[in-house]
From Swiss-Prot:
Signal peptide: none
Name assigned to this protein: Hemagglutinin-neuraminidase
Role of this protein: Mediates the viral entry into the host cell together with fusion/F protein. Attaches the virus to sialic acid-containing cell receptors and thereby initiates infection. Binding of HN protein to the receptor induces a conformational change that allows the F protein to trigger virion/cell membranes fusion. Neuraminidase activity ensures the efficient spread of the virus by dissociating the mature virions from the neuraminic acid containing glycoproteins.
Region Involved in neuraminidase activity: start-end pairs: 234-239
Regions crossing the membrane: 27-48
Catalytic reaction equation(s): Hydrolysis of alpha-(2->3)-, alpha-(2->6)-, alpha-(2->8)- glycosidic linkages of terminal sialic acid residues in oligosaccharides, glycoproteins, glycolipids, colominic acid and synthetic substrates
Topology in membrane: Single-pass type II membrane protein
Virion surface side, ranges: 49-577
UniProt note: domains: The C-terminus (head domain) is involved in binding the cellular receptor.
Annotated organism of origin: Newcastle disease virus (strain Beaudette C/45)
KW Ribonucleoprotein (keyword) present: no
Gene Ontology cellular component terms for the protein in this record: host cell plasma membrane; membrane; viral envelope; virion membrane
Length: 577
């Protein structure tokens, strides 16, 4: 009994002890809370004593300023990020791609030479300075928004003249042809010793070179190989093209006047030649009796050719034999191109009749004057596998001198305005299976040529005539989808006479401010233009090789006119130069 009572008493003591400790804990917590609260009140009182209401009002302003600084810093960092992205994601890959393209072109050229070493095709393929890598044969200005004519040529720049000039009063240098690839350029012109109208004998100057930059950054055209073809062959109307084996050239060989040639019954002799990198020239006559079986006269287009898909492509033109298969298939075919905002007032039936007659001008005995394109396989064997394409006259005007151009992945045929249509024409060209197809042309209404009435510069109606002058445009400005927007060229700014050589940038309807060679009375003739970029400086240049009158030494002097393409927003046209 006593033991049970003791056990109960012990449990009561333990319970009482627990309650005591709980009370002590609660009191301690309460005291700690009171102390903390007192400390907080004291701190708040101190803080209120140190800060006034005006101080509190300024806090949002300071926060806003801090926010602006942070935003500005972040924006600056974003600019850096954007520049890094542009460099890494856009510019560097493009530069690498351009470098790769040039290296591949050089390797291709070297491969051709190695394969043909046994045939003395030459060694040591030249190449432009690195500053030009990715700046030749490319879409130089890609711009969807700017006015095309806000781009304009600078004044002509002094540079090394790479073109020989006449050395006597009776000497004549004429008919320049130029083409430039990613590795080298090719140039040729005709030389007559006794005046420009002599058709009986001439020799041909042919040169191969590269673009260089001087220590001060100036551009010069460095001639590495050249030859004067002064033999018994009278080469005329030559076109040149830069290929992986050197400078390929297509010439006709004539001993009679142009009119006499068109009145003959057989095609004109034609030869495919090449100036190799070793400075040696080789040539082979083409089998014109087969290739031009339906022709009585056939000439290269004078303008440069183009190397495409392992073949060299040249513009050609001439007269078809009446009632031959090639002549018959074109019977009744015609095309009428119209001036911008200047409609021909003649009746439609009359326009069609005159358009059809324009292909058979009386000057050449009523022969159909036809446009064509000749492609030849580029190999160590000259004249290999020639293929002639004759486009339908539902696309092309009367046959005339021309040029094949490649810019980026696009190909074009320029056709001289020898017929009634004065504005410059560039036909888009596609190639497949050794042949070419031409499409409806780009026209440049302000890029005209002088001509005899009724086919003068302002002419707007179809007529039969043989007139005009060779002044090719070079594709310069493109949309991002690779559609052509604008060209550069040197036109003869005159209604009827070959006067006033004038350089400008042209869109489909108008032109930029201009640069004149000299006064409006300056005589001139053929011009051929090519543009390129110095990638290191991102500056675009255009070269116009122009026949300019030369009263002391020869009738004409061929001058390489060099301009930089500048940009000036809001200026449509201004006289300069």
């Amino acid at each position: 009994m006593d033991r049970a009572v003791s056990q109960v008493a012990l449990e009561n003591d333990e319970r009482e002890a627990k309650n005591t400790w709980r009370l002590i804990f609660r009191i301690a917590i309460l005291l700690l809370t009171v102390v903390t609260l007192a400390t907080s009140v004291a701190s708040l009182v101190y803080s209120m004593g140190a800060s006034t209401p005006s101080d509190l009002v300024g806090i949002p302003t300071r926060i806003s300023r801090a926010e602006e600084k942070i935003t500005s810093a972040l924006g600056s960092n974003q600019d850096v990020v954007d520049r890094i992205y542009k460099q890494v994601a856009l510019e560097s890959p493009l530069a690498l791609l351009n470098t790769e393209t040039t290296i591949m072109n050089a390797i291709t050229s070297l491969s051709y030479q190695i394969n043909g070493a046994a045939n003395n095709s030459g060694w040591g393929a030249p190449i432009h300075d690195p500053d030009f890598i990715g700046g030749i044969g490319k879409e130089l200005i890609v711009d969807d928004a700017s006015d095309v004519t806000s781009f304009y040529p600078s004044a002509f720049q002094e540079h090394l003249n790479f073109i020989p000039a006449p050395t006597t009063g009776s000497g004549c240098t004429r008919i320049p042809s130029f083409d430039m690839s990613a590795t080298h350029y090719c140039y040729t012109h005709n030389v007559i010793l006794s005046g420009c109208r002599d058709h009986s004998h001439s020799h041909q100057y042919l040169a191969l070179g590269v673009l260089r930059t001087t220590a001060t950054g100036r551009i010069f055209f460095s001639t590495l190989r050249s030859i004067s073809l002064d033999d018994t062959q009278n080469r005329k109307s030559c076109s040149v093209s830069a290929t992986p084996l050197g400078c390929d050239m297509l010439c006709s060989k004539v001993t009679e006047t142009e009119e006499e040639d068109y009145n003959s019954a057989v095609p004109t002799l034609m030869a495919h030649g090449r100036l190799g990198f070793d400075g040696q020239y080789h040539e082979k006559d083409l089998d014109v009796t087969t290739l031009f079986e339906d022709w009585v006269a056939n000439y290269p287009g004078v303008g440069g050719g183009s190397f495409i898909d392992g073949r060299v492509w040249f513009s050609v033109y001439g007269g078809l034999k009446p009632n031959s298969p090639s002549d018959t298939v074109q019977e009744g075919k015609y095309v009428i191109y119209k001036r911008y905002n200047d409609t021909c007032p003649d009746e439609q039936d009359y326009q069609i009749r005159m358009a059809k007659s324009s292909y058979k001008p009386g000057r050449f005995g009523g022969k159909r004057i036809q446009q064509a394109i000749l492609s030849i396989k580029v190999s160590t064997s000259l004249g290999e596998d020639p293929v002639l394409t004759v486009p339908p006259n539902t696309v092309t005007l009367m046959g005339a001198e021309g040029r094949i151009l490649t810019v980026g992945t696009s190909h074009f045929l320029y056709q001289r305005g020898s017929s009634y249509f004065s504005p410059a024409l560039l036909y888009p060209m596609t190639v497949s299976n050794k042949t070419a197809t031409l499409h409806s042309p780009y026209t440049f209404n302000a890029f005209t040529r002088p001509g005899s009435i009724p086919c003068q510069a302002s002419a707007r109606c179809p007529n039969s005539c043989v007139t005009g002058v060779y002044t090719d445009p070079y594709p310069l400005i493109f949309y991002r989808n690779h559609t052509l927007r604008g060209v550069f060229g040197t036109m003869l700014d005159s209604e009827q006479a070959r006067l006033n050589p004038t350089s400008a940038v042209f869109d489909s309807t108008s032109r930029s401010r201009i640069t004149r060679v000299s006064s409006s009375s300056t005589k001139a003739a053929y011009t051929t233009s090519t543009c390129f970029k110095v990638v290191k400086t991102n500056k675009t240049y255009c070269l116009s090789i122009a026949e300019i009158s030369n009263t002391l030494f020869g009738e004409f002097r061929i001058v390489p006119l060099l301009v930089e393409i500048l940009k000036n927003d809001g200026v449509r046209e201004a006289r300069s130069g």
